[in-house]
Amino acid sequence: MFESVVQLLEEHEELQQQLGDPELHADASRSRKVNRRYAELSRIVAAHAEWTQLGDDLAAARELAEEDPAFADEIPGLEQALDAAQEKLRRLLIPRDPDDARDVIMEIKMGEGGAESALFAADLLRMYLHYAESRRWKTEVLSQTQSDLGGYKDVQVAIKGTSDDPALGVWAHLKYEGGVHRVQRVPATESQGRIHTSAAGVLVIPEVEEVEEVAIDPNDLKIDVYRSSGPGGQSVNTTDSAVRITHLPTGIVVAMQNEKSQLQNREAGMRVLRARVLAKQQEEIDAEASAVRRSQIRTMDRSERIRTYNFPENRIADHRTGYKAYNLDAVMDGALDPVVESCIQADEEARLDALGTDA
């Protein structure tokens, strides 16, 4: 069992030697890749060592129990621990999403529901910012268009992780947030106390780590400049600092007006554009992928209603995994881990079913 681990153990040793080579650290890109792979394999190495040790302990306990029945009491506990260690190792051997260690760019847009939808978009932004803070991730608001009541018609935020371990990566956790988020509550603008249903859309894409990773020909870009506007459309700048970038081959349009400098807005716009072009390329690859890939949770389906936030009942429900809890107030304050973990587990189960093997 777990014959494939032997090769991974050898690879882990090779990477460990590479990490001790000063020349590796002179190449930032290669160093990052080696560190990430080493961190990923370190989990497998530790889990395999635990599984092996428990197997040895169980064998020893059974042998001793033949001579001294007192040792028989240890056997059930060791068997249970061995089964748990085996399941842990089995899950770690599931092929990971190659983008799991990447940082992300998240866009939250108001949907059906007008002003209430924009307010909900602001609540979602706050939830994700608090969640990022709890995981010690760094956040940067790249662009925002506010509504009249203080919500957001559209807001884009970059979220950057602090670990080389793909299992702790930002994309590994937030890729499941893409889709339509529905809210049920009494809007601030509702005078009769009636519950309304509205929605906001969330798009999450992995960020491009190196400019060379996505080839964008400057001749394929149409760049327009204009004056920044605030809530209600009023101008908030006397210079043409806002930038709209159109990628002609794909039709992708990115608009930035958050910074006071046109150059800063252009740099931020290109950052988002590269990520969107990469995501589109990946979507095209996924569209041609096997049923194995398509059977997994649809992380990039922007039209899918993925979750409902019911404020009167303090209930949150994820429609993909069946997760339900009555702690919506805590979730909106950033306690999102249980929801995310339910998605990760469902994804792992789908991958295991698709593989059709016990590894």
Swiss-Prot record:
Give the record's PTM text. Methylated by PrmC. Methylation increases the termination efficiency of RF1.
Q: Which GO terms describe its molecular function?
A: translation release factor activity, codon specific
Single GO cellular component term:
cytoplasm
Pfam short name (any one): RF-1
Q: Which InterPro entries match?
A: PCRF, Pep_chain_release_fac_I, Pep_chain_release_fac_I_sf, Prokaryotic/Mito_RF, RF-1
The entry's keywords: Cytoplasm, Methylation, Protein biosynthesis
Name the major location: cytoplasm
Q: What does this protein do, in the record's words?
A: Peptide chain release factor 1 directs the termination of translation in response to the peptide chain termination codons UAG and UAA.
Matches recorded under PROSITE patterns: RF_PROK_I
The source organism is Clavibacter michiganensis subsp. michiganensis (strain NCPPB 382)
Residues modified to N5-methylglutamine: Q234
Indicate the family of this protein.
Belongs to the prokaryotic/mitochondrial release factor family.
Localization per Swiss-Prot or TrEMBL: Cytoplasm
Q: Can you tell which superkingdom this protein's organism belongs to?
A: Bacteria
- Name under which the protein is recorded: Peptide chain release factor 1
The family database entries (PANTHER family) matched by this protein are listed as: LD18447P
